[in-house]
Amino acid sequence: MSDLTQAAATAPDTVAQAVPPPRGRVRWVICGLLFAAVVLSYIDRLVLGVLKPQLTALYGWTNSGYGDITGYFQVAYGLGFLLFGWLIDRIGPRAGYMLAMGAWTVGHFAQTLVTSTTGFALARIPLALGEAGTFPSALAAASQWFPKKERAMAIGIFNAGANVGAVVTPLLIGFLIADLVLDWRWAFIVTGLFNLVWLTAWWQLYHPPHSHPRITPEERAWIEAEPVETTGRAGFLTVLRHRESWSYMTGRFLIDPVWWTFLFWLPDFFHSRYGYDLKNFGPPLVAIYIMADVGAIVGGWYSSRLLKRGVETGRARKRAMFACALFALPVMFAAQASSIWVAVAMIGLACAAHQGFSTNLFALPGDQFPRYAQGTLIGLGGFAGAAGGFIASKALGALLDRVGSYQPFFIACGVAYLVALLVFHILNPRYRNVRIGGV
């Protein structure tokens, strides 16, 4: 990226061991902004899922129709990931994040104007396109602001914003619609206003390390103490020539559908299986996503701890991913749980496993690729994940209309992570730095 700082020639692992953490915490303020953006992204994304039982009763939606809304959202999201992956490499995360949140705020407000599944599917296209810029922008910012030894932890922190957003959404929407007895459209209006506050804060507070007015010299040196990287650009075809790219993309294709379907369909599962509604969705969803929040942080902490103990980067990432894959297995039995809280425990454990697994998978572009190629790879990975999510959402909607059972979905969720890790290891056994264009 053009606005990256000059770096020292010392290897990052050596520097991290020789230099103590610096004075100055600007990078953690940046991490806090990234965390807040992910929270808002997930709130805006999940409002519709929480409202689904009410909107289905009001407007006669079918599961297949709702599957179309979520499926086409993911198509637009995948295309947006390709766009923003390419764009962030060229304009940087500051302008990129402004553009992304501006677009998704327009789409979020547009949902107040429609009632049919077709109308919602169309209104959510700009929402999906804009939200697709969240992780390319956040990961690019993390690559700017955090050395390798801290990067997985930083990613884990802002990745946990997804779970905080998922926790807040049912409580907030339940308060607005069930307690205050407001029209459902107010759920979109109130949550959309939060985005405008964040946009103002981001524009004022985010700058790259070399030009940030509040960074200390010690903190800048800590961030810049990595090998100088040759600047350049890498297109899609260039990135796709490398097996390491396919390991990342395949991982996203296999595990992202699990998270997507949990996000969009869990309220419906609790409604159809246990009779829960907008007034009592809160406690089970809060419990699930608090568990997921812990998983995101622990997954990043565990691999970062292994790295600080001298474990090779690829081995540390894969150890953490394997542990997470094992914790996902019990969710295969969630559909048969007689008690909602047994189901919550199984699903929450799987969500924690997903977040820990994805935290380490998301670290791959920063670990293995030059910075000018990372956004492109992240975009390709997001497209692959959205493609998998589209297939899963369409299939689940049709399955529910025909047989009314979530059982096949939960079985697939349980085994997805072990399969993903196996394919990942086959395609990326040595986890070495990728050379692009002779760099």
Please describe what each predicted stretch is.
Residues L46, Q74-L82, A166-V167, Y289-D293, ...:
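Residue-level signature of mid-helix packing/kink "hotspots" within the transmembrane helices
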Residues F158-H210:
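Helix-loop-helix hairpin linking two adjacent transmembrane segments in secondary transporters
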Residues L48-G49, R243-G299, H354-S358, F362, ...:
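Extracytoplasmic gate region of multi-pass secondary transporters
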Residues A95-F109, R315-M332:
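Structural signature of the two symmetry-related core transmembrane helices
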Residues L79-T118:
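Conserved MFS/SLC helix-loop-helix module at the cytosolic interface between two early adjacent transmembrane helices
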Residues G60, G92, L113-G119, G130, ...:
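Helix-breaking motifs and short loop linkers at transmembrane-helix boundaries and internal kinks
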Residues G366-V403:
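A late C-terminal transmembrane helix in Major Facilitator Superfamily
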Residues A123-A162:
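Cytoplasmic helix-loop-helix junction between adjacent transmembrane helices
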